Protein backbone atom coordinates (compact mmCIF):
# COMPACT_ATOMS: atom_id res chain seq x y z
CA UNK A 1 0.00 0.00 0.00
CA UNK A 2 2.16 2.77 -1.25
CA UNK A 3 1.06 6.26 -2.28
CA UNK A 4 -1.08 4.80 -5.08
CA UNK A 5 -3.52 3.39 -2.48
CA UNK A 6 -6.54 5.65 -2.09
CA UNK A 7 -7.38 4.49 1.42
CA UNK A 8 -4.92 2.27 3.27
CA UNK A 9 -7.10 1.95 6.41
CA UNK A 10 -10.03 0.73 4.34
CA UNK A 11 -7.64 -1.74 2.67
CA UNK A 12 -7.20 -3.41 6.07
CA UNK A 13 -10.97 -3.61 6.24
CA UNK A 14 -11.03 -5.31 2.84
CA UNK A 15 -8.51 -7.86 4.11
CA UNK A 16 -10.66 -8.50 7.18
CA UNK A 17 -13.81 -8.73 5.04
CA UNK A 18 -12.09 -11.23 2.73
CA UNK A 19 -11.08 -13.40 5.68
CA UNK A 20 -14.72 -13.46 6.84
CA UNK A 21 -15.52 -15.11 3.51
CA UNK A 22 -13.09 -17.99 4.23
CA UNK A 23 -10.64 -16.74 1.61
CA UNK A 24 -6.93 -16.70 2.37
CA UNK A 25 -4.74 -13.66 1.83
CA UNK A 26 -1.03 -13.11 1.50
CA UNK A 27 0.12 -10.03 3.39
CA UNK A 28 3.19 -8.73 1.59
CA UNK A 29 5.18 -7.13 4.39
CA UNK A 30 7.31 -4.17 3.27
CA UNK A 31 6.22 -4.66 -0.34
CA UNK A 32 4.76 -1.33 -1.42
CA UNK A 33 3.98 -0.53 2.19
CA UNK A 34 2.40 -3.85 3.10
CA UNK A 35 0.06 -4.76 0.27
CA UNK A 36 -2.40 -7.63 0.37
CA UNK A 37 -2.42 -10.31 -2.33
CA UNK A 38 -5.92 -11.72 -2.79
CA UNK A 39 -7.30 -14.00 -5.48
CA UNK A 40 -9.35 -12.01 -7.99
CA UNK A 41 -12.79 -12.93 -6.66
CA UNK A 42 -15.58 -10.72 -7.94
CA UNK A 43 -16.91 -10.16 -4.40
CA UNK A 44 -13.54 -8.72 -3.34
CA UNK A 45 -13.32 -6.39 -6.33
CA UNK A 46 -16.89 -5.23 -5.76
CA UNK A 47 -16.22 -4.53 -2.10
CA UNK A 48 -13.04 -2.61 -3.01
CA UNK A 49 -15.05 -0.41 -5.34
CA UNK A 50 -17.76 0.17 -2.70
CA UNK A 51 -15.20 1.15 -0.05
CA UNK A 52 -12.97 3.19 -2.34
CA UNK A 53 -9.96 0.90 -2.04
CA UNK A 54 -7.49 0.77 -4.92
CA UNK A 55 -6.73 -2.68 -6.31
CA UNK A 56 -4.60 -3.86 -9.21
CA UNK A 57 -5.29 -7.07 -11.11
CA UNK A 58 -2.03 -8.87 -11.90
CA UNK A 59 -1.02 -11.72 -14.18
CA UNK A 60 1.28 -14.68 -13.56
CA UNK A 61 4.37 -12.78 -14.74
CA UNK A 62 3.57 -9.92 -12.36
CA UNK A 63 3.18 -12.43 -9.52
CA UNK A 64 6.56 -14.04 -10.25
CA UNK A 65 8.19 -10.58 -10.27
CA UNK A 66 6.52 -9.65 -6.97
CA UNK A 67 7.68 -12.86 -5.30
CA UNK A 68 11.19 -12.34 -6.67
CA UNK A 69 11.35 -8.77 -5.38
CA UNK A 70 10.15 -9.89 -1.94
CA UNK A 71 12.69 -12.71 -1.87
CA UNK A 72 15.56 -10.37 -2.71
CA UNK A 73 14.58 -7.49 -0.42
CA UNK A 74 13.86 -6.83 3.23
CA UNK A 75 10.35 -8.20 2.78
CA UNK A 76 8.27 -11.20 3.76
CA UNK A 77 4.93 -12.87 3.14
CA UNK A 78 2.48 -13.75 5.90
CA UNK A 79 -0.37 -16.09 5.04
CA UNK A 80 -3.64 -14.98 6.65
CA UNK A 81 -6.10 -17.86 6.86
CA UNK A 82 -8.89 -16.83 9.22
CA UNK A 83 -10.41 -13.65 10.51
CA UNK A 84 -8.88 -12.74 13.85
CA UNK A 85 -10.96 -12.18 16.93
CA UNK A 86 -9.75 -8.77 18.07
CA UNK A 87 -9.96 -7.12 21.49
CA UNK A 88 -9.04 -3.61 22.51
CA UNK A 89 -7.89 -3.17 26.10
CA UNK A 90 -9.69 -0.02 27.20
CA UNK A 91 -11.65 1.17 30.24
CA UNK A 92 -15.41 0.81 29.86
CA UNK A 93 -15.97 4.57 30.17
CA UNK A 94 -13.73 5.50 27.23
CA UNK A 95 -15.42 7.12 24.28
CA UNK A 96 -14.75 5.85 20.72
CA UNK A 97 -12.86 9.04 19.88
CA UNK A 98 -10.52 8.67 22.88
CA UNK A 99 -8.05 6.44 21.05
CA UNK A 100 -6.72 6.08 17.55
CA UNK A 101 -7.05 2.28 17.47
CA UNK A 102 -10.81 2.37 17.99
CA UNK A 103 -11.22 5.11 15.40
CA UNK A 104 -9.08 3.26 12.85
CA UNK A 105 -10.85 -0.09 13.30
CA UNK A 106 -14.28 1.54 13.11
CA UNK A 107 -13.28 3.40 9.97
CA UNK A 108 -11.77 0.28 8.39
CA UNK A 109 -14.92 -1.70 9.29
CA UNK A 110 -12.99 -4.29 11.30
CA UNK A 111 -14.93 -6.02 14.07
CA UNK A 112 -13.56 -5.90 17.60
CA UNK A 113 -14.64 -6.16 21.20
CA UNK A 114 -13.40 -4.23 24.20
CA UNK A 115 -12.17 -5.63 27.46
CA UNK A 116 -10.52 -4.27 30.54
CA UNK A 117 -9.16 -5.41 33.86
CA UNK A 118 -12.11 -7.56 34.98
CA UNK A 119 -12.08 -9.58 31.76
CA UNK A 120 -8.29 -9.93 31.74
CA UNK A 121 -8.36 -11.03 35.39
CA UNK A 122 -10.99 -13.67 34.52
CA UNK A 123 -8.79 -15.14 31.75
CA UNK A 124 -10.81 -13.80 28.81
CA UNK A 125 -7.69 -12.88 26.81
CA UNK A 126 -7.50 -16.49 25.64
CA UNK A 127 -10.75 -15.89 23.72
CA UNK A 128 -8.96 -13.48 21.36
CA UNK A 129 -6.34 -13.80 18.64
CA UNK A 130 -5.22 -10.19 18.75
CA UNK A 131 -5.05 -7.62 21.55
CA UNK A 132 -4.60 -3.91 20.95
CA UNK A 133 -3.13 -1.72 23.67
CA UNK A 134 -2.41 1.95 23.44
CA UNK A 135 -0.07 3.77 25.81
CA UNK A 136 -1.46 2.06 28.90
CA UNK A 137 -0.04 2.81 32.33
CA UNK A 138 0.45 -0.45 34.22
CA UNK A 139 2.38 1.21 37.06
CA UNK A 140 -0.73 1.99 39.09
CA UNK A 141 0.00 5.71 39.04
CA UNK A 142 -3.38 6.63 37.49
CA UNK A 143 -2.00 7.86 34.19
CA UNK A 144 0.09 10.69 32.84
CA UNK A 145 -2.24 13.56 33.72
CA UNK A 146 -1.66 13.75 37.47
CA UNK A 147 0.40 16.91 37.36
CA UNK A 148 -1.98 18.90 35.18
CA UNK A 149 -5.38 17.41 36.06
CA UNK A 150 -5.21 15.75 39.49
CA UNK A 151 -7.94 18.08 40.81
CA UNK A 152 -10.24 17.67 37.81
CA UNK A 153 -13.44 15.73 38.44
CA UNK A 154 -12.86 13.31 35.55
CA UNK A 155 -9.40 12.49 36.93
CA UNK A 156 -10.69 11.89 40.46
CA UNK A 157 -13.50 9.72 39.04
CA UNK A 158 -10.93 7.67 37.11
CA UNK A 159 -8.81 7.24 40.23
CA UNK A 160 -11.85 6.01 42.18
CA UNK A 161 -12.70 3.64 39.33
CA UNK A 162 -9.19 2.16 39.31
CA UNK A 163 -9.19 1.75 43.09
CA UNK A 164 -12.64 0.13 43.05
CA UNK A 165 -11.61 -2.38 40.37
CA UNK A 166 -8.43 -3.27 42.27
CA UNK A 167 -10.38 -3.81 45.50
CA UNK A 168 -13.11 -5.85 43.77
CA UNK A 169 -10.46 -8.10 42.21
CA UNK A 170 -8.88 -8.68 45.61
CA UNK A 171 -5.77 -6.51 45.35
CA UNK A 172 -4.47 -4.21 48.06
CA UNK A 173 -3.51 -1.49 45.58
CA UNK A 174 -3.94 -0.40 41.99
CA UNK A 175 -0.19 -0.94 41.59
CA UNK A 176 -0.48 -4.65 42.48
CA UNK A 177 -3.58 -5.13 40.36
CA UNK A 178 -2.06 -3.48 37.27
CA UNK A 179 1.12 -5.53 37.70
CA UNK A 180 -1.02 -8.69 37.65
CA UNK A 181 -2.82 -7.48 34.51
CA UNK A 182 0.54 -6.83 32.81
CA UNK A 183 1.66 -10.36 33.71
CA UNK A 184 -1.55 -11.80 32.26
CA UNK A 185 -0.92 -9.92 29.02
CA UNK A 186 2.69 -11.14 28.98
CA UNK A 187 1.47 -14.73 29.39
CA UNK A 188 -1.11 -14.19 26.63
CA UNK A 189 1.67 -13.17 24.23
CA UNK A 190 3.87 -16.02 25.44
CA UNK A 191 1.07 -18.43 24.60
CA UNK A 192 0.81 -17.17 21.02
CA UNK A 193 -1.52 -14.17 21.28
CA UNK A 194 -0.72 -11.17 19.10
CA UNK A 195 -0.23 -7.76 20.67
Describe each PLM feature range.
Residues 1-103, 108-110:
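Hydrophobic targeting/anchoring helices
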Residues 7-10, 96-98, 123-124, 139-148:
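Extracytoplasmic/secreted cell-surface and envelope-processing proteins
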Residues 26-28, 113-116, 132-133:
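A structural signal for short, well-ordered beta-strand segments and their strand-loop junctions
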Residues 46-49, 122-127:
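Short loop/helix-cap segments at secondary-structure boundaries that form the rim of catalytic
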Residues 75, 118-121, 183-185:
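Generic recognition of flexible, low-complexity loop/linker segments
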Residues 79-82, 123-126, 188-190:
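Extracellular/periplasmic catalytic domains that process cell-envelope and extracellular macromolecules
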Residues 109-124:
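A short, well-structured beta->alpha microelement
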Residues 128-195:
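Short alpha-beta junction capping motif
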Amino acid sequence: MDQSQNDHLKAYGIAYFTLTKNTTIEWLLNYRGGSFLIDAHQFVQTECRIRGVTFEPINVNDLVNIYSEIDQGNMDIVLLEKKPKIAIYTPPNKQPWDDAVTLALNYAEVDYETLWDNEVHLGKLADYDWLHLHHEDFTGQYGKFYRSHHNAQWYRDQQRQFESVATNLGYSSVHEQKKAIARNIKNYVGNGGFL
